[in-house]
Structures are given as C-alpha cells and as structure tokens.
C-alpha cells in the first residue's frame, strides 16, 4: 500500500497531463499533490523519509521553474537528479561507515557476506545511473507525451525488472548459505 501512496503524485501528474495535454498544468497540480503527500506522511507517522524530502524539494524547485517560466524541460530533469543523488549516496556508502546503504536497509533481515552486500549496493548505483541517463535520453529525444508515459511506466517497469533480477541474485546466495 505504501508503494501506491508513494506513486500517487506521479499518477496524478500523469492523469492531469493525459486530460489536458499540458505539462505546465500537470506540473502545477503535481506541486500541491506532493506537498499534501509529504504533509500527510508527517501527520500520520511524525517522520518523513529523506527520499520524500528530496523529491518534494525538487518538485517545488523544478516544478516551480516549469510553471513560472512556462518551460516543461525543468520538470523533466527531476528523475535524473533524484537518481543521480541516490547513485552518489549509495556509492559514497561504500566508503563511509561499516555498512553500505543496502546492508543498512536489509542487514537485519538477511545474513550475507560482505562481497554480496557490496555487489548489491553497486548494482543499485549502476541502476540509478542508467535510470537517470535513460530519463534524459527519453526526455530530450522524444516527444513530451512519450516522456510522460516513460516517467510513469518506463521508470516503474525498469525498477520492477531490476528488483526481480536482484531477487534472483539474492536467492542464489541464500540457497548457497543453507
């Protein structure tokens, strides 16, 4: 259920764009939708994930520029910037602290060797880079409408495929441990 809630502003953006064909209007709706989403999360949990704060800041900054300047190119950069920041954070976690980000997130649930944790973390770094570059390619090589479709379905599809592949990789190491 949480994943659906996380995607709600993107879905709203998509629906408004499909109804109006106007990225400026869709972005103008995305901004308050994201603010409401983060506000609701804070009200419900009294905490906000860093990912949501980064996304909110970029939606307000790049979405605001899109609306104020009437230029949809600004909002098209958001997925690439988010993915770039995640790639930097995950890569940096390889060198800072005892555990990388993936191990911090999943280490209490899975007992894996350091090499596997490192491979998983670096795979995420690669995924974030590929996602960010692919977003830029689609955003600036294809029509706006194609990019809007890609933003919802393409990036989500890439993420699902990557998680499945990661699960297959993990299962082979979990079976070897038994």
UniProtKB/Swiss-Prot annotation:
Domain of life, source organism: Bacteria
Topology in the lipid bilayer: Multi-pass membrane protein
Keywords from the named record: Cell inner membrane, Cell membrane, Membrane, Transmembrane, Transmembrane helix
GO cellular component, as recorded: plasma membrane
Pfam hit, one: IspA
Stored InterPro entries: YciB
Chain ranges passing through the membrane: 1-21, 23-43, 51-71, 77-97, 120-140, 150-170
Statement: the UniProt record of this protein carries the keyword Transmembrane helix: yes
Main location: membrane
Subcellular location as annotated: Cell inner membrane
Function: Plays a role in cell envelope biogenesis, maintenance of cell envelope integrity and membrane homeostasis.
PANTHER family: INNER MEMBRANE-SPANNING PROTEIN YCIB, INTRACELLULAR SEPTATION PROTEIN A-RELATED
Similarity comment: family membership: Belongs to the YciB family.
Name of the molecule in the record: Inner membrane-spanning protein YciB
Species the sequence originates in: Marinomonas sp. (strain MWYL1)
């Amino acid at each position: 259920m949480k994943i659906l809630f996380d995607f709600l502003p993107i879905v709203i953006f998509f629906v408004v764009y499909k109804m109006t064909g106007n990225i400026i209007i869709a972005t103008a709706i995305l901004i308050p939708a994201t603010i409401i989403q983060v506000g609701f999360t804070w009200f419900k949990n009294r905490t906000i994930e860093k990912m949501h704060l980064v996304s909110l800041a970029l939606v307000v900054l790049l979405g605001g520029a899109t609306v104020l300047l009437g230029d949809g190119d600004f909002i098209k950069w958001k997925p690439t910037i988010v993915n770039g920041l995640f790639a930097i954070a995950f890569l940096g976690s390889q060198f800072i602290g005892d555990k990388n980000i993936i191990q911090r997130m999943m280490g209490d649930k899975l007992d894996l060797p350091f090499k596997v944790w490192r491979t998983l973390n670096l795979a995420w770094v690669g995924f974030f880079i590929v996602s960010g570059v692919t977003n830029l390619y689609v955003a600036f090589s294809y029509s706006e409408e194609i990019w809007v479709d890609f933003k919802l379905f393409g990036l989500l599809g890439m993420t699902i495929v990557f998680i499945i592949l990661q699960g297959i990789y993990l299962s082979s190491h979990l079976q070897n441990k038994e």
